[in-house]
């Protein structure tokens, strides 16, 4: 499980100049997407945010990840891969990259909410060791879909960190 090998993209910190492209990806992939102003807040003013993008050799953004580091916990706040680039390991690589960097800043557990119908995201999370721990009924405002709460406990998180090269 190393999507970092032989990849045709780079992962780097998100910068304000990325926001319009990140916003378009979010709008294409999410029924409830963040306004552009939220991305500006996350990249420019939120000290808890850790924002990443995957870019190809032309500099086009393929996906993004926004994490919030709160003491020793990392919360997956927003995460998407452009529809044309899904199922190519980009999402997994982004998440691993973000988790490893957060580990180096002291994170030891991670948590998130995911739509119950988002099977591809659930698959990525479970592959990395996240486990469902509860349901938030009617969590999403657009269709009242449930959110599955998932945690990555310390032991599974340690395994991800130790598998890096």
Where are these regions (language model features)?
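Conserved catalytic-core motifs of GNAT/GCN5-like acyltransferases
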Residues: 113, 131-148
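Conserved hydrophobic beta-strand within the GNAT/NAT acetyltransferase core sheet
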Residues: 76, 110-114
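Short glycine/proline-centered loop/turn elements that form peptide/ligand docking sites
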Residues: 95, 118-121, 138-143
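Residue-level recognition of the GNAT/N-acetyltransferase active site
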Residues: 82, 86, 115-117, 142
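Acetyl-CoA-dependent GNAT
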Residues: 4-9, 13-84, 95-97, 101, ...
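Conserved active-site tyrosine of GNAT-family acetyltransferases
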Residues: 125, 130, 150
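Conserved acetyl-CoA-binding loop-helix of GNAT-fold acetyltransferases
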Residues: 87-100, 123-127
């Amino acid at each position: 499980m190393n999507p970092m090998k032989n990849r045709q993209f780079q992962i780097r910190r998100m910068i304000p100049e990325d926001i319009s492209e990140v916003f378009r990806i979010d709008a294409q992939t999410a029924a409830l997407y963040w306004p552009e102003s939220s991305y500006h807040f996350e990249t420019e003013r939120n000290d808890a945010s850790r924002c990443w993008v995957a870019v190809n050799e032309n500099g086009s953004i393929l996906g993004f990840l926004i994490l919030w580091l709160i003491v020793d916990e990392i919360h997956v706040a927003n995460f998407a891969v452009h529809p044309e680039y899904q199922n190519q390991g980009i999402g997994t690589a982004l998440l691993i990259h973000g988790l490893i960097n957060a580990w180096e800043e002291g994170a030891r557990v991670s948590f998130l909410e995911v739509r119950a119908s988002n099977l591809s995201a659930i698959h990525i999370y479970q592959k990395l060791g996240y486990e469902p721990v509860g349901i938030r009924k009617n969590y999403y405002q657009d269709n009242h879909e449930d959110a599955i709460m998932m945690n990555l406990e310390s032991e599974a998180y340690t395994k991800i960190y130790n598998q890096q090269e």
